[in-house]
């Protein structure tokens, strides 16, 4: 069987064997409902508490109760935006939300929905580097602004947004601040207190944990109307039977992610740079976005004259997994939205390929990818009508 190379880690990651190992007893033996009063339920409580401890420490939250378990970051993002709509827009008349054009569809689409309910949403444009400035946020805030929602790191370019500066502005202005940290956790340090964040969304499967489990940090003292009703789970904030094995797995994945931050920077970052430098030797290849202020595992490459989907399938035939952008929208085959937002032509925006590494990738895999990608570029350009 040919070697398979996985370079789509911004879409999802393989589960760490240590995570799988710690989850296994709760799938086989300790399967009781944590809300039950008998021993099958109560024996799960220490493991849940330990997992929550790992989670809140991993993002430097103030208290273990500040982290609420959800099914994924999409739920967390929806909860924040819709909860703020109920708490701030309807009850207090603060009918304005600020976000960016570069957000994940889980934020953008929810904002579109809120617009249909009468909420005014400002979508801040990104500059030619793929980022925004804190001053843009400051200038957009009005007396009616209820929430600012800006991702910590972009899922396509890997660009890191100025979260600490934005957090300071929001604190000064008395505006709630939410960040989608899905692409930041496990790649760079995330500190909710230092960043003055009120809400932070994350998802375990993006840092080598299981799919179907995520979390929402809610700063102590900040209220948020529940999205789900029907139980008193998570101190009455999020109804639904606790998914014990996945909570345990997510906690361990967070612990391992924090422990590997230096490895991400020193080893994964160097592998990404090696891949990038080799591909830039191909004529008419460019890296999209700022190459300095970004997470260490991600590169968004544009190969002029080659449709991103064509390159994607050519790589796939060689057992190399990559992406043309967000996996949540990859079946749409639309032009890369970040490239469109920075002003690239629609034709050029269709040429984007995202390569995202993890701590499980090897140098041999990168060497093989360079070889296959370079050969594919020549072959596809020979049959391209636009090059």
From Swiss-Prot:
Similarity annotation: Belongs to the class-V pyridoxal-phosphate-dependent aminotransferase family. NifS/IscS subfamily.
Protein's name according to its UniProt entry: Cysteine desulfurase IscS
Primary site of residence: cytoplasm
Protein's pathway: Cofactor biosynthesis; iron-sulfur cluster biosynthesis
Keyword Lyase: no
Assembly and oligomerization: Homodimer. Forms a heterotetramer with IscU, interacts with other sulfur acceptors.
Gene Ontology MF terms in the entry: 2 iron, 2 sulfur cluster binding; cysteine desulfurase activity; metal ion binding; pyridoxal phosphate binding
Pfam assignment, any one: Aminotran_5
Annotated keywords: 2Fe-2S, Cytoplasm, Iron, Iron-sulfur, Metal-binding, Pyridoxal phosphate, Transferase
Job description of the protein: Master enzyme that delivers sulfur to a number of partners involved in Fe-S cluster assembly, tRNA modification or cofactor biosynthesis. Catalyzes the removal of elemental sulfur atoms from cysteine to produce alanine. Functions as a sulfur delivery protein for Fe-S cluster synthesis onto IscU, an Fe-S scaffold assembly protein, as well as other S acceptor proteins.
Species annotation: Helicobacter pylori (strain J99 / ATCC 700824) (Campylobacter pylori J99)
């Amino acid at each position: 069987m040919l070697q398979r190379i996985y370079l789509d880690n911004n879409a999802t990651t393989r589960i760490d064997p240590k995570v799988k190992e710690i989850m296994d007893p709760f799938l086989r033996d300790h399967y009781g409902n944590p809300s039950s009063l008998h021993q099958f339920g109560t024996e799960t409580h220490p493991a849940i508490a330990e997992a929550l401890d790992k989670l809140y420490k991993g993002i430097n939250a103030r208290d273990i109760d500040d982290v609420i378990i959800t099914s994924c970051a999409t739920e967390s993002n929806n909860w924040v935006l819709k909860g703020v709509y109920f708490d701030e827009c309807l009850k207090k008349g603060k009918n304005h939300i600020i976000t960016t054009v570069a957000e994940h569809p889980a934020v953008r689409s929810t904002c579109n929905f809120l617009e249909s309910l009468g909420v005014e949403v400002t979508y801040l444009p990104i500059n030619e580097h793929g980022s925004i400035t804190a001053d843009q946020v400051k200038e957009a805030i009005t007396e009616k602004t209820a929430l600012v929602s800006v991702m910590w790191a972009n899922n396509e370019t890997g660009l890191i947004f100025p979260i600490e500066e934005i957090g300071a502005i929001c604190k000064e202005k008395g505006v709630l601040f939410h960040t989608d940290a899905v692409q930041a956790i496990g790649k760079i340090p995330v500190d909710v207190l230092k960043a003055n964040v009120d809400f932070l969304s994350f998802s375990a499967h993006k840092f080598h944990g299981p799919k179907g489990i995520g979390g929402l940090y809610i700063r102590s003292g900040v209220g948020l109307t529940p999205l789900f009703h029907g139980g008193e789970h998570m101190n009455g904030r999020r109804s639904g039977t606790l998914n014990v094995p996945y909570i345990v797995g997510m906690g361990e994945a967070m612990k391992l992610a924090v422990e590997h931050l230096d490895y991400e920077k020193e080893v994964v970052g160097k592998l990404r740079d090696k891949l990038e430098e080799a591909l830039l030797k191909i004529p008419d290849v460019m890296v999209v976005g700022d190459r300095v202020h970004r997470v260490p595992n991600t590169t968004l490459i544009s190969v002029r004259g080659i449709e991103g989907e064509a390159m994607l399938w050519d790589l796939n035939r060689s057992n190399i997994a990559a992406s043309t952008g967000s996996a949540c929208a990859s079946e749409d085959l639309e032009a890369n939205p970040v490239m469109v937002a920075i002003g690239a032509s629609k034709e050029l925006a269709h040429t984007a390929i995202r390569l995202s590494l993890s701590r499980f990738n090897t140098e041999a895999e990168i060497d093989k990818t360079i070889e296959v990608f370079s050969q594919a570029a020549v072959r596809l350009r020979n049959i391209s009508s636009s090059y």
